[in-house]
């Protein structure tokens, strides 16, 4: 596997031919390092292709086949998540969990509020809190800045995994790293594990 530069894009080449996505689009990106990483994933494959060992290829396929032609719908879905964001729903008890949520989530939330220039409403438990239209409009303006299709596909994946547009924006804007994003998204679960231990089936 190698990389071919053509028409301002870097194509993944297999045996001299341009690789294609499942939807038959050319597997090509605007970044040479990304293209080289894609080629390395393909080069590492044995006789049988194992998609599970090709996370970057899966992301780029998703970006080119599922996001590139549906950018507005993908952006709109991220904004919808902001309307019921996981970080806005806080525990009322026990006190250690309440404190942990405040310690971990509140700085991230405050950072994103400062970034977008708008405030989120918080709720306790599962009572729905409708976010102000101004807040969602501010989120939409910043989601619109996420480059497509690759970064947008990555952001959509993060949102799906975390249930949080706030965490997605924080990661996309370099406010937190991937490990902190994951830890924040699984704060409640990690707290329960700390109390009750690891669920063997979940593990």
Residue map of PLM features:
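Short, charged/polar micro-motifs that form catalytic or ligand-binding hotspots
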Residues: 25-28, 94-98, 152-157, 171
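Generic secondary-structure signature for well-ordered alpha-helical cores
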Residues: 43-47, 110-117, 171-176, 186, ...
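Short coil/turn segments at secondary-structure boundaries
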Residues: 51-54, 124, 197
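Internal, conserved structured core segments that host functional sites
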Residues: 72-138
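An internal, amphipathic alpha-helical element
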Residues: 130-201
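Solvent-exposed alpha-helices and their adjacent loops that cap or buttress functional pockets
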Residues: 4, 20-21, 80, 144-147, ...
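An N-terminal structural lobe/cap that precedes and organizes the functional/catalytic core
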Residues: 1-69
């Amino acid at each position: 596997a190698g990389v071919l530069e053509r028409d301002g894009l870097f194509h993944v080449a297999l045996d001299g031919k341009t690789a294609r996505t499942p939807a038959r689009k050319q597997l090509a990106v605007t970044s040479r390092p990304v293209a080289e990483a894609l080629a390395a994933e393909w080069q590492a494959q044995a006789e049988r292709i194992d998609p599970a060992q090709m996370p970057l290829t899966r992301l780029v396929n998703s970006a080119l086949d599922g996001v590139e032609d549906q950018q507005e719908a993908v952006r709109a879905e991220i904004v919808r998540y902001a309307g019921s964001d996981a970080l806005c729903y806080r525990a009322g008890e026990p006190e250690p969990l309440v404190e942990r949520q405040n310690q971990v989530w509140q700085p991230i939330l405050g950072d994103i509020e400062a970034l977008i220039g708008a405030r989120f409403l918080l709720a306790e438990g599962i009572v729905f809190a409708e976010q102000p239209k101004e807040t969602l409009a501010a989120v939409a303006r910043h989601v619109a800045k996420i480059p497509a299709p690759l970064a947008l596909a990555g952001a959509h994946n993060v949102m799906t995994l975390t249930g949080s547009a706030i965490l997605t924006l924080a990661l996309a804007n370099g406010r937190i790293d991937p490990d902190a994003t994951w830890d924040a998204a699984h704060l409640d679960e990690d707290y329960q594990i700390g109390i009750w231990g690891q669920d063997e089936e979940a593990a």
